[in-house]
Amino acid sequence: MIRNRGGAIIVQEGKIALIKRIREGETYYVFPGGGIEEGETAEEATKREIYEELGVHVKVEHLIAKVEYKGTEYYFNAHIIDGVFGSGKAEEFKLKDRGSYIPLWLPIHELEKVSIKPYEVVGSICNHYKK
């Protein structure tokens, strides 16, 4: 299914916020975010999805990467401004047939060592945070 998506790159104290997925015997990581609803901008979708998935409100800043992966995906630098990380109540977290969703902080230097989807974003993140 092709769907445009907004995602957040949240880095704090040398760690990046990710969601660990365990599904059908496969373990991989994704950047928090989700589908852009009709009438929403990519930035608005990113804020909404981050709250649903992580339980935090974010300030969305500049675009770090734009990737074609099952639709156009926009990844923004974002900072947590309120909330409790890991307290998200997204519907997909409750559906057993969707596998496990585990919000976590991964040391940014380990980003290139894990299975991450879409991997194309990793280079942009590494370049951005080496500045």
Enumerate the predicted regions with their spans.
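Conserved hydrophobic "DFG−1" position in protein kinase catalytic cores
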Residues: I10-V11, L18, A78, W105
